[in-house]
């Protein structure tokens, strides 16, 4: 069975969206294989997670945001879970996310000099899922 990794980001936890996100995962028929609440995430872990972005001019605010508060991380499984979860999340940029997606319903567009608060992360490929699961668990 295919697996993917997800994060409910600090904005999702702070805004009380954990239950809503987990409900959508379960309603879709996916199995929650692992779930862990992290009250604090280190900069080192975030740097490893976003290794392809480290060094980019836009990266420091992402690191700051991802270490700003608690997160919920997990592994879900099911048929075509990577593709389906990414569809359920919606577009990265809130203004492009369709209604009915997690980001379309709950994400906040960034103002000038603000970081996008898009509630969730999901692995973008089978390779990324394996790497991220090994990194976080």
UniProtKB/Swiss-Prot annotation:
Keywords: ATP-binding, Cytoplasm, Kinase, Magnesium, Metal-binding, Nucleotide metabolism, Nucleotide-binding, Phosphoprotein, Transferase. InterPro entries: NDK-like_dom, NDK-like_dom_sf, Nucleoside_diP_kinase, Nucleoside_diP_kinase_AS. Its cofactor is Mg(2+). It is found in: Cytoplasm. GO terms for molecular function: ATP binding; metal ion binding; nucleoside diphosphate kinase activity. ATP binds at residues 9, 58, 86, 92, 103, 113. Pfam families: NDK. Its EC number is 2.7.4.6. One of its GO terms (cellular component) is cytoplasm. It is an enzyme of class 2 (transferase). Its main location: cytoplasm. It catalyses: a 2'-deoxyribonucleoside 5'-diphosphate + ATP = a 2'-deoxyribonucleoside 5'-triphosphate + ADP; a ribonucleoside 5'-diphosphate + ATP = a ribonucleoside 5'-triphosphate + ADP. The active site is at 121 (pros-phosphohistidine intermediate). GO terms for biological process: CTP biosynthetic process; GTP biosynthetic process; purine nucleotide metabolic process; pyrimidine nucleotide metabolic process; UTP biosynthetic process. It comes from the Bacteria. Major role in the synthesis of nucleoside triphosphates other than ATP. The ATP gamma phosphate is transferred to the NDP beta phosphate via a ping-pong mechanism, using a phosphorylated active-site intermediate. Belongs to the NDK family. HAMAP family: NDP_kinase. Homotetramer. This is Nucleoside diphosphate kinase. The gene is ndk.
């Amino acid at each position: 069975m295919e697996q993917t990794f997800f994060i409910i980001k600090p904005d999702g936890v702070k805004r009380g969206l954990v239950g809503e996100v987990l409900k959508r995962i379960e309603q879709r028929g996916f199995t929650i294989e692992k779930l862990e609440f992290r009250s604090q995430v280190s900069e080192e872990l975030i740097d490893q997670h976003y290794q392809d972005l480290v060094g980019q001019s836009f990266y420091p605010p992402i690191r700051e945001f991802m270490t700003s508060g608690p997160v919920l991380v997990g592994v879900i499984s099911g048929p075509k879970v990577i593709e389906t979860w990414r569809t359920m999340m919606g577009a990265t940029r809130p203004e492009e996310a369709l209604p009915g997606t997690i980001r379309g319903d709950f994400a906040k567009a960034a103002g000038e000099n603000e970081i996008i608060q898009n509630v969730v992360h999901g692995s973008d490929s089978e390779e990324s899922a394996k790497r991220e699961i090994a990194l976080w668990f």
